[in-house]
A protein has these predicted regions:
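Helix-loop-helix module between adjacent transmembrane segments
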Residues: 95-96, 116, 128-138, 169-178, ...
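Alpha-helical transmembrane segments of multi-pass membrane proteins, especially transporters
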Residues: 54, 58, 92, 122-126, ...
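Membrane-embedded alpha-helical segments and adjacent helix-loop junctions characteristic
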Residues: 74-160, 294-369
Length: 436
């Protein structure tokens, strides 16, 4: 991370009293109650008589912050970080066209056809999923690759669960490599002021070692099932890839990477590349636009408003002071262990994106904010492997598998996820402190 992080722009402290709130609640109490209720709904999602997903819970919280008078509409609009939204949108447009062209299915099949033993298939799934996720967002990779993997495994009649866990965990770990790997990395990349290349260089040993550890752990835990050779050859129907469209998509992504490596604006390059892709694709834009995760953009925008309302209560200042007091005077090792422990815990309580947002103003005030941002990116990502509900990628794999009659149990996942998470976070801290 090449230049010092900066605190976000915006108001601090409670809003002035000249407003007429729709709900007669004290701003302090209302802000705290709305924030807590929103994060409970995000974490739990299912309560008696309440069925809300994360974007819906975030939207309700954002609207409640304005309705209760915690924020004015103008303050709510100003709270939304358009750099993050624009960056996500531009990347999603390019990825959407690659999906339309069946690039991800083709890439998955190209790898799977070359393996002949269970152990090599596991390595291909973990490493291949990780590398794809480092570039094209782990959620998308899991969404597209899971059905391809299940079809391949059904042909050789082996239990698919170990490989599904390998895909989910490998995708999570590999996504730590770059700012395009997952949503929380995008937040860290923009807020920390890191360049694309700087982030990549510092996270390379973290992600590479993490993938090796993940494979080794899975190889050991499922050593009986991963021994020998497949009873039959992996056979899959050929994917009808749209070569011109895929070439254009990969070319535009390559142009974007060159722009990022040159130090140009992350969101500016992303949205320009996405817009150019719409222009040159020569396909109905609706196909790609339909694949944009609008619900994720809504979730981010809503969380920005909720967090600004929480900030207006003064609670963020209290958290900042407590965190600084806890870590102040610590060595780089102490800071890294402290931040990784907090982020791993928060990421499994309230999800990794809200956890990173919660620490947006805290990290720049820590003794070594550059190291702290890297640890936040690493630990919030690796913590997604702890439990089945730890990341959206995990849930996508589980839901896709369940649609084909394969259920991944909570404890079945946890017995693998817990050791993988502990080992990879320990490695991540060591790598960032020693090589950073």
């Amino acid at each position: 991370m090449d230049r010092p992080a900066h605190a976000p722009r915006g108001v601090r402290g409670a809003p002035r009293s000249g407003r007429r709130p729709l709900l007669q609640l004290g701003n302090l109490t209302a802000g705290l109650v709305i924030f807590a209720a929103t994060y409970v709904l995000i974490a739990v999602q299912r309560l008696p008589f309440v069925h809300l997903n994360r974007p819906a819970a975030g939207l309700l919280g954002a609207v409640a912050m304005v309705a209760a008078g915690v924020l004015t509409p103008a303050q709510a609009y100003a709270a939304i970080d358009l750099d993050v939204i624009v960056f996500l949108l531009g990347l999603m447009l390019i990825v959407g066209y690659l999906e339309v062209g069946h690039f991800f299915e083709w890439a998955a099949q190209s790898v799977l056809r070359r393996v002949q033993t269970p152990a090599r298939l596991m390595a291909a799934v973990v490493i291949g999923g990780g590398l794809l996720s480092a570039l094209f967002v782990n959620d998308t990779v899991c969404l597209v690759v899971t059905p391809v993997l299940l079809v391949a495994l059904s042909a050789v009649r082996v239990r698919p669960t170990p490989y599904l866990l390998g895909l989910a965990m490998g995708s999570n770990v590999g996504s730590a490599l770059s700012v395009t790997g997952n949503p929380q990395n995008m937040l860290v990349g923009i807020w920390s002021g890191s360049s694309f290349g700087g982030f990549l260089i510092h996270m390379l040993p973290v992600a590479a070692g993490g993938l090796a550890i993940t494979y080794a752990a899975l190889r050991w835990i499922f050593r009986t099932e991963l021994s020998g050779r497949f009873p039959e050859r992996l056979e899959m129907a050929t994917v009808d890839i749209d070569r011109p469209l895929v070439f254009k998509g990969l070319a535009m992504f390559g142009v974007a990477v060159i722009g990022w490596l040159a130090g140009w604006s992350l969101p500016g390059v992303a949205i320009a590349a996405g817009a150019l892709m719409v222009l040159i694709a020569q396909r109905d834009p609706a196909y790609a636009i339909d694949r944009v995760e609008w619900s994720l953009l809504l979730f981010f925008a809503s969380l920005f408003v909720v967090m600004r309302g929480f900030q207006a209560t003064g609670a963020v200042d209290w958290i900042d002071h407590r965190a600084i007091a806890l870590i102040d005077g610590q060595s780089r090792w102490g800071l890294a262990w402290g931040v990784s422990g907090v982020m791993a815990t928060l990421s499994n309580l309230i999800s990794n994106v809200p956890a990173v947002m919660l620490w947006r103003t805290t990290v720049p005030q820590l003794p070594d904010p550059v190291l702290a941002w890297r640890v936040v990116a690493m630990s919030s990502t690796f913590a997604g492997n702890l439990l089945l509900i730890g990341s959206v990628a995990n849930l996508i794999v589980a839901e896709r598998a369940e649609g084909r009659g394969i259920r991944i149990g909570f404890w079945e996942y946890a017995r693998v996820g817990i050791p993988v998470t502990i080992l990879t976070i320990v490695w991540g801290v060591v790598a960032l402190v020693v090589f950073g």
